[in-house]
A protein has these predicted regions:
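Alpha-helical transmembrane segments of multi-pass membrane proteins predominantly involved
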Residues: 1-314
């Protein structure tokens, strides 16, 4: 995960302009801070479990398997151990750009080269989510009900704030930055749903992979739609020489093919049936309902409707 940070920071500053250099520096500094927070959390976890492997950490929770707030697990029954897990989650929050760890996203999206930002919005996020799933579902699943609520809260905040702030953006790249925050929230709904479903009733094995499966499907759908949108934005931006949404007026007349590609990508990002993101959202929100997270599913649907406003405005 860290090996992706340094080259992406260099690529973000590749254009050597003021905004590009600022984007690269912000990405590097925020990446370093998140790495330090994660390492401190890992140190605390190692200190209380005596293991650096996910299997060893998971084994320390087996006898007996209780939650932090219920007590009873020697390795996980201390406040310091809980802090370690929270710090680990905070570090991942920076990597996947969730609220309230998203402050770097709009500036980096606006200042970095568009092809680099397209890669960053997909590859970096996918890698971070893949590792998050591996770490928390393999190493901390026996105490998952302790962090599932935090995942749900992060998902709700990211969906609401990401979509609401995106409405007021005039720069299309900043708009996509806030949009990526909202999409991170949708993905976290699947993470929280997978945990809640399995933790709520162990007699429902069919729910075990619903959350992770929905996350992986949505990541693939989001990657395809987002890369397509950035391809169109790059081509249109080179022709009109501007990233302002108001300057996109008349693009359908001057470049009908590019406008059509962008329109299809935006329809997919909204989740218009029968696009892949619609299927992904249906998968995620169904998992949330099955996991008794109905409020989160409703919030996700409302947030999707809000996102349609600023996507259609483009």
């Amino acid at each position: 995960l860290e090996l992706t940070t340094l080259p992406l920071a260099a690529l973000a500053a590749f254009m050597m302009t003021r905004t590009s250099s600022e984007a690269g520096m912000k990405f590097l500094i925020i990446g370093a801070i998140s790495s330090a927070i994660m390492l401190y959390g890992m140190a605390l976890i190692f200190g209380f479990t005596g293991s650096t492997t996910l299997e060893g950490i998971a084994a320390s929770f087996q006898e007996p398997a209780q939650t932090v707030f219920g007590g009873g697990v020697p390795a996980f029954g201390s406040f310091a151990m809980l802090v370690g897990v929270v710090l680990l989650l905070v570090g991942f929050g920076f990597k996947i750009s969730t609220v309230p760890f998203q402050m770097w996203v709009p500036d980096v999206y606006e200042g970095g080269p568009t092809p680099v930002i397209a890669f960053l919005s997909v590859a970096s996020k996918a890698a971070a989510f893949a590792i998050l799933l591996r770490v928390f579902f393999s190493g901390f699943f026996d105490v998952s009900l302790d962090w599932a609520g935090l995942m749900a809260a992060l998902a709700a905040a990211s969906m609401v704030i990401g979509n609401l702030v995106a409405i007021g953006q005039s720069n299309i790249r900043r708009l996509f930055g806030y949009s990526s925050i909202a999409h991170a929230g949708y993905i976290l709904v699947g993470v929280a749903a997978g945990v809640k479903a399995t933790g709520a009733d162990s007699n429902l094995p069919e729910f075990i992979s619903v959350g992770p499966d929905s996350v992986l499907f949505y990541l693939g759908a989001y990657a395809a739609a987002n890369l397509t949108a950035f391809f169109a934005i790059t081509a249109i931006g080179n022709r009109i020489g501007s990233d302002l949404i108001e300057d996109y007026a008349g693009v359908a007349r001057r470049s009908p093919v590019l406008a059509a590609i962008l329109a299809l990508a935006l329809a997919a990002l909204i989740g218009v049936p029968p696009t892949s993101i619609f299927i992904g959202k249906l998968y995620i929100f169904t998992a949330a309902v099955n996991a008794d997270l109905v409020w989160l599913a409703i919030l996700g649907v409302v947030s999707s409707v809000v996102s349609a406003y600023y996507y259609v405005r483009i």
